[in-house]
Design a protein with these regions (language model features):
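Hydrophobic face of amphipathic alpha-helices that form TPR/SEL1-like repeat modules
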Residues: 9-16, 45-57, 91-103, 135-146, ...
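Terminal, low-structured helical/coil segments at or just beyond the last alpha-helical repeat
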Residues: 170-216
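Short coil/turn and helix-start
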Residues: 18-22, 36, 55-68, 82, ...
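Short helix-capping/linker turns of helical repeat alpha-solenoids
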Residues: 1-3, 16-18, 37-39, 53, ...
Length: 216
């Protein structure tokens, strides 16, 4: 794996043009060597490159041209995530997350079919490693009941959402960061506080419905 990471580092040098003349084609080759050797960072780099190219193709000419690129991006993000790369796990959640577009268009754009259950599982994996963007998406899915396998788990989902939102707030109060990151953290913290209020409102609603049934 040491050789694989060396390929990744070499690819980074050529991709960014640091210390050597920039050569993105050569960088891609080195990243591929690294990915084949098991470097999660190299796989993530390839996923990022192909995702950016897919987006560029989708924005410019024909949507179908982006399909193989988006599929490649998803493949490499999955490879990296399975090797423990946390941002790639978050990216997989983002790719699977259902949107208000047809499934065929979703697959063309993101390289996978929409699947909220898969999205939730990947967000949960990254959230467990305290990756803040994943924590926000995971708790939002829990709150909205998206990707749930069984309605009987609703109370457990709300408990989990409360736990994750609370951890986001505590993290924001402890971590020192620059101005831009601080502003982003403040927005996430405010969203988390709003999420906690919504959780309490949902619990009160469930209690009220239970009471009304009991009185019938």
């Amino acid at each position: 794996n040491g050789y694989a990471e060396a390929w990744f580092e070499l690819g980074q040098l050529y991709y960014t043009g640091q210390l050597v003349r920039q050569d993105k084609s050569r960088a891609l080759t080195y990243f591929e060597h690294g990915a084949r050797g098991g470097s999660a960072q190299a796989s993530h780099a390839l996923g990022t490159i192909y995702a950016e190219r897919a987006q560029s193709s989708a924005d410019s000419l024909f949507m179908d041209e982006a399909t193989p690129l988006s599929a490649l991006a998803a493949r490499y993000f999955l490879q990296a995530a399975q090797n423990g790369h946390i941002p790639s796990a978050y990216n997989m959640g983002h790719l699977y997350l259902c949107r208000d577009i047809p499934s065929k268009e979703h697959k063309s754009r993101y390289g996978v079919l929409p699947d909220d259950r898969n999205a939730r599982e990947w967000f949960a994996a990254a959230s467990s490693k305290l990756f803040l963007p994943a924590m926000m998406n995971y708790s939002a899915m829990l709150l909205e009941g998206r990707g749930a396998g069984d309605m009987d788990t609703r109370e457990a989902d709300l408990d989990e959402a409360q736990r994750v939102y609370t951890r986001v707030i505590h993290t924001g109060s402890r971590v020192a960061m620059g101005k831009s990151a601080q502003e982003s953290m403040e927005r996430m913290t405010e969203t988390a506080r709003r999420g906690l209020r919504l959780i309490e409102e949902q619990r009160e609603s469930v209690k009220a419905k239970g009471s009304s049934r009991g009185g019938e």
